[in-house]
Amino acid sequence: MKNIIILIINTGSSSLKFTLYEYQYQSEQILASGIIEKIKTTQAIIKIKFKNKLLELTNLNIKSHKKALKHLIKTLTNKKTKIINYLDQIQGIGHRIVHGGAQFKNSVIINQNVLNELKKISHLAPLHNPIAIKVIEQMFILFPNAKQVACFDTSWHQTMNQKAFLYATPYSWYKDYHIRKYGFHGLSYAYITKRTAIILNKNIEDLNLIILHLGNGASINAVQKGRSYDTSMGLTPLEGLVMGTRSGDIDPTIIPLMSKILKKTTKQIENILNKESGMLGISCKSNDLRDIWIESNNNEYNSKLAVEIMTYRIKKYIGSYLAALDFNIDAIIFTAGIGTSDYEIRKLSLQGFEKIGIKIDFQKNNLAIDKNTEYDISSNQSNIKILVIPTNEELTILEDTYDLIKNN
């Protein structure tokens, strides 16, 4: 197949990220990339990089994602940018979809049946899926000749066994209402697994890994024989690790209890657990770990406590996944913003594991701070590899989109 132009779209509740690629198998060139922010306001911003230039438009009246798409098209095709000459040059559009439920085990070409299924599970990701669906529908109007592909953050985890994904709630909740662990960050984990296989020169099917995706949102994935075996996020991204603003694991009775005490609805309490908890909640200052480290290094109590709680939770999950994988793993990998740049978090997360042969090289670890560079930070005496690998979720979407277009 000749080089084709593919547009990658990542729809947020008030933003639209995009990258335009010229792509041929395992060879990609970025033609343009950018973001439209503050959608649904009169202060919207468009930032776009192309041909070593940066274009920024501010104070735009963009009241909907539909209008944002029209601005995007205008920006890609106008005489000033000349990124593409006409819309039909774009042959494929890959969408990142937060939640695919249990229906979508792989990326798929979008048709009306796929859209109907997505609408049925919109309640599982009410902040993201409905807007993504609207964007897809608008894209069918704007790009009638392009094939659209849905790539799901949940698909990677569809290989989990029932013992890993079921909650110990009435079984009818699962059968009738699809209440179960789905997991997220799947596009990241798929990329990291594939990349680790290349680095270690092993077949993917032979890989057992523990991958830590540590950013403002954070999760851990146990990988057995190259497939997702267990993960920390659940029905929603709220379960699991302590995150920037999310609480992670809590006793569920806290919700009705605090609802009664604070005289707030359960929806309001859920919002607090999602947006006012985690590192922000404990530190009482910030969800940004860089800010928290400044305070922690000045011996500020809550900031130190936030780091301790965060890394303690990570250690517990690493230990439990080591046991779940029968202590048979090839590597532990750190990825995403915090995972690739914060050597202290990596050190604290693995503290104590040297007693079972998982040994970090402190000097290598301290030097591993470039978010765009891969590192091996394991000691020569370590029984397994400890790696730092920047993730590339867009590349997973790009490759899946290309493969599906090529074969259909």
UniProtKB/Swiss-Prot annotation:
Looking at the UniProt record, the site noted as Transition state stabilizer sits at 185, 246
- NCBIfam families from the entry? ackA
Q: Which organism is it from?
A: Borrelia recurrentis (strain A1)
A GO term, aspect molecular function: magnesium ion binding
Record family assignment: Belongs to the acetokinase family.
Q: What is the lineage of its organism?
A: Bacteria, Pseudomonadati, Spirochaetota, Spirochaetia, Spirochaetales
The role this protein plays is: Catalyzes the formation of acetyl phosphate from acetate and ATP. Can also catalyze the reverse reaction.
Q: Which gene encodes it?
A: ackA
- Obligatory cofactor(s): Mg(2+); Mn(2+)
Please list the residues that bind substrate: 96
Which domain of life does this protein belong to?
Bacteria
Binding of ATP, residues? 17, 213-217, 288-290
Where it sits in the cell: the answer is: Cytoplasm
Q: Which reaction does it catalyse?
A: acetate + ATP = acetyl phosphate + ADP
Among SUPFAM superfamilies, the record links this protein to:
Actin-like ATPase domain
How cofactor binds (record note)? Mg(2+). Can also accept Mn(2+).
- Subunit arrangement? Homodimer.
Q: Name one GO biological process term.
A: acetyl-CoA biosynthetic process
Q: Which pathway, metabolic or otherwise, does it act in?
A: Metabolic intermediate biosynthesis; acetyl-CoA biosynthesis; acetyl-CoA from acetate: step 1/2
Disulfide bond residue pairs: none
The UniProt record lists the EC number as: 2.7.2.1
Protein name, per record: Acetate kinase
Give the UniProt entry's GO cellular component terms. Answer: cytoplasm
Please list the residues that bind Mg(2+): 10, 393
Catalytic residues identified in the record: 153 (proton donor/acceptor)
